[in-house]
Structure formats: C-alpha cells, structure tokens
Amino acid sequence: MAFSITVPASTANLGPGFDSIGLALNRYLHLEVEQASKWSFICSSPGLENIGTDNLVTKAATFASKEWGKVLPPCQVVMKNDIPLSKGFGSSAAAIVAGIELAASVCGQFASKAEKARLASLWEGHPDNVAASIYGGLVIGTHSEESTEILHVEAPNIDLVALIPSKTLATKKARAVLPDMLSYKEAVQASSVANVLAAALVKQDWELVGKMMLADRFHQPYRQQLIPHLPDVCAYAQADEDAYGAALSGAGPIILCLVKEGKGEAFASRLHKQFPACRAEVMRPAVQGSAVSIAQA
C-alpha cells in the first residue's frame, strides 16, 4: 500500500498561551510512504539530506503502534519539508504527527483526531504544536498524564508575517532560561493574561489579542535574552496601523506578527526594512490539519 501524509507547521503560545495555544501554518511536511522490506528515508530538503532511519517520524510511529498493540512494518519514505528547522514553527511536532499518521495507516488502526492528539501530547509533553498540526486552525489545550483536552477553533482570517533570523535556537536551550517557579501573585497575573488572550482569540478581537501577546509573563520576558530584538519587533508591530501585534513563535527565534487580512505583503516589506538582518515572510493560517491520501493504483 502506498500513501501520502501532509502535516502543517504550527506556531505555539502566541505570547501567554504557553504550552497551550497553537495555530496551524501553511508550511508543510510531506511524506510519500510505501511498505518495504526495510526502513529507508529519502529527503533533499535543507537540513534533512542525510536523515537516517532513527528519526522522530519512526520513533513516534513506533510509540503509537506499541500503544495500539500493533506491529509496525518497515516502510520506504520519501520526504519533502518546507518547515524551517529549529526556528519555532513546530518542525519536530510535525514529524511526530507524521509518525502517528504513518503508524495508523500501515497498521490499519482507526484513530480520531482526539486520540492522535493524546498520543502526540504524551510523546511531546504539551499539546499546542501537535494539536494544531492535527486539527488545523487554532487550538487551545491542556495536557496531563491522565488526560488531554483540546478545543478546536476554525482558522482566523488574518495574515501572518514571520520575521526569520538566520540562526536556529534549540528548544532545550530556550527552556533552560525559564524560571523553575513563579510566585503565587505572578502566577495569578500571568494566568489572567492568558485567559483573556484565549477569549480574545475565540471572539477574534485582534486588537485585544495583540495587547495580551505583549503582556505575557510566562516565557517571553526570560527568552528575550536569547532574542535581543524581540522587544523592538513587538513594539514596532504594536505601533503599525496594519498589525495587531507580535509574539515569539514557540521557543523562537522566529517572531510572528499578526496582520490585517490583505496587508501582509506591505507590512512584511516595512518590517524587513526595519530589521534587515532577518527575512520577512508572509504566511496564512492552515485551515486543514494532517491528512492521509491513498495512492491510486
């Protein structure tokens, strides 16, 4: 059986929605899969030319198949990827989701989106990126060892402009600068900001979304030491008439700006002139989540 898997990229957090809020993006990981006598991966995409068989796709596929009590047969995989690696667009999450989709297909296992999100969250430790890649659109979720709850909201009609530096940033390094704990007072304030962000996203009150992204207390104040231009970019987006605001995308270093629909190209041009060391790329939210297509005989 031959089939293809397509998984969208994602951005997470949107400021204070730390490890909870995710948005699917129109950049994709694409796999062409066929059962074979042994595992093999072929990829010519930048950074993945020498990918071996011991990778996140096979690890997640093995994990899922074991959870289902199935035997995972080897496959030949031809991979194409246009999600930037280690930049904050959920490249690892997309690989995890692709692995779960692969396992479900080759093992003949039906799995709902909720079940896939549960498995992916167990592997990843948080639901934001993986759930966005599975459902598409916007997701707000919570995860523990006992349960995973995901609220799915349709993709918003806005433009997105990503400010992309040349350097990468490992998630492990970005998490290392976070505090071990917040005081009760700090946690209450940070939580209230996140609550308003979630409500504003659901109501599509984009002015309020931008304001709340800037008010994050969970991670951006600590991570700006790794991305020194973050405050300047956020201030620039907040002041621009076509932008609602900006936030670190996931762990960074990409900074994602939320922009009025149809204004992305013009804003991206201005943003690049202001921050010429980075690339400004116009994007859109991805409406559809991960999908599997069976090849026609």
From Swiss-Prot:
GO terms for biological process: threonine biosynthetic process. Its EC number is 2.7.1.39. Transmembrane segments: none annotated. Keywords: Amino-acid biosynthesis, ATP-binding, Cytoplasm, Kinase, Nucleotide-binding, Threonine biosynthesis, Transferase. The gene is thrB. Catalyzes the ATP-dependent phosphorylation of L-homoserine to L-homoserine phosphate. It comes from the Bacteria. Its main location: cytoplasm. It catalyses: L-homoserine + ATP = O-phospho-L-homoserine + ADP + H(+). One of its GO terms (molecular function) is homoserine kinase activity. Signal peptide: none annotated. This is Homoserine kinase. One of its GO terms (cellular component) is cytoplasm. Pathway: Amino-acid biosynthesis; L-threonine biosynthesis; L-threonine from L-aspartate: step 4/5. ATP binds at P84, L85, S86, K87, G88, F89, G90, S91, S92, A93, A94. HAMAP family: Homoser_kinase. It is found in: Cytoplasm. Disulfide bonds: none annotated. Belongs to the GHMP kinase family. Homoserine kinase subfamily.
